UniProtKB/Swiss-Prot annotation:
PANTHER family: COENZYME PQQ SYNTHESIS PROTEIN B, HYDROLASE C777.06C-RELATED-RELATED. This is Coenzyme PQQ synthesis protein B. The gene is pqqB. It comes from Acinetobacter baumannii (strain ACICU). Pathway: Cofactor biosynthesis; pyrroloquinoline quinone biosynthesis. Signal peptide: none annotated. NCBIfam families: PQQ_syn_pqqB. GO terms for biological process: pyrroloquinoline quinone biosynthetic process. InterPro entries: Metallo-B-lactamas (IPR001279), PQQ_synth_PqqB (IPR011842), RibonucZ/Hydroxyglut_hydro (IPR036866). It comes from the Bacteria. Belongs to the PqqB family. May be involved in the transport of PQQ or its precursor to the periplasm. It holds the Pfam family Lactamase_B_2.
């Protein structure tokens, strides 16, 4: 399985266009050791030619420009992207579908709850239905594994997780099964497994066992502390209120990751306020010392 990190930041990217927090100001002026990052999305493939997007970020045009393998150039209009899987209906994971309209008809896999959001509050399916066949909806049963034509060795097993529907959703404060999923992706040829959960509000015993059984875990790294948005003065909500588990301290994701013998542990969906973006920070050093990597745009993993 080929895994390519198209974007590794949370909503707004890094630096966020209107933000002057220490991180955003520092990367903009070159005064901190940090990489510019686009909004989170990854691509996976079993042959290096045909690819599946996991989430479609607002930055998808630039991401695909930087990802040369996505353009095999076999004909006048071409792409290696044949399918999109949505983990949720968050704007930073779905607005890229509008940019992909020239590639319609496009196969889009999501749960019924996500489809409801994307036909009402943010009706992107409706908007594009007259655009050369539009978005072709494939329903994900959040309790059942599925396969995708053309990717015969890959099996996708959804996992219902605790997080939150987007602010525009009518059930933002009324959680439903299928609002958010993680994915266990198994490559039956290499016998390797990826666990992907860019939006993760809680780690329970089931998730711990799945992560232990995986060869690579790539999970939510939005915030270093639960009150980070408040402490930096850019927001009023805690991470948990937004559906994101913080990294540090008791009950943080790092305390769980440190219990795993999983070969590769990666944090993705990193907010612009998070000190781990500064590669000279104590927080970045702590992750490195514990064998946890910080995802960056262009990162490649082979399983």
């Amino acid at each position: 399985m080929h895994i390519y990190i198209l974007g590794s930041a949370a909503g707004g990217g890094f630096p966020q266009w209107n933000c002057n927090c220490p991180n955003c100001h520092g990367v903009r002026t070159g005064t901190i050791n940090a990489k510019v990052r686009t909004q989170s999305s990854i691509a996976i493939s079993e042959n290096g030619v045909d690819w599946i997007l996991l989430n479609a970020s607002p930055d998808i045009r630039q991401q695909l420009f930087d990802f040369k393998a996505a353009q095999p150039a076999r004909k006048l209009r071409d792409t290696g992207i044949t399918n999109v899987i949505l983990m949720d209906s968050q704007l930073d994971h779905t607005t890229g579908l509008l940019t992909l309209r020239e590639g319609c008809p496009m196969n889009v896999w999501c749960t019924e709850m996500v489809y409801q959001d994307l036909t009402t509050g943010f009706p992107v399916f409706n908007m594009l239905k007259h655009w050369n066949g539009g978005l072709q909806y494939h329903q994900i049963d959040p309790k059942q594994a599925f396969k995708i034509n053309g990717f015969e060795n890959l099996e996708f097993l959804p996992l219902i997780i605790q997080s939150a529907a987007p602010p525009y959703s009518p059930h933002r404060h009324d959680p439903h099964e299928g609002d958010n999923i993680a994915l266990i992706i198994k490559d039956h040829k290499t016998q390797k497994q990826l666990f992907y959960a860019p939006g993760l509000g809680k780690i329970d015993d089931q998730i711990m066992q799945i992560m232990q059984d995986s060869d690579c875990v790539m999970i939510d790294g939005t915030l270093w502390t639960d009150d980070e948005m408040q402490q930096t003065g850019v927001g009023k909500k805690t991470g948990r209120e937004m559906g994101h588990l913080y990294i540090s301290g008791e009950g943080g994701s790092l305390s769980y990751l440190n219990q795993l013998s999983t070969p590769k542990k990666v944090l993705i969906h990193i907010n612009n306020t998070n000190p781990i973006l500064n590669e000279n920070s104590a927080q970045f050093a702590e992750l490195k010392a514990n064998g946890v990597e910080v995802a960056f745009d262009g990162m490649q993993i082979e399983l």
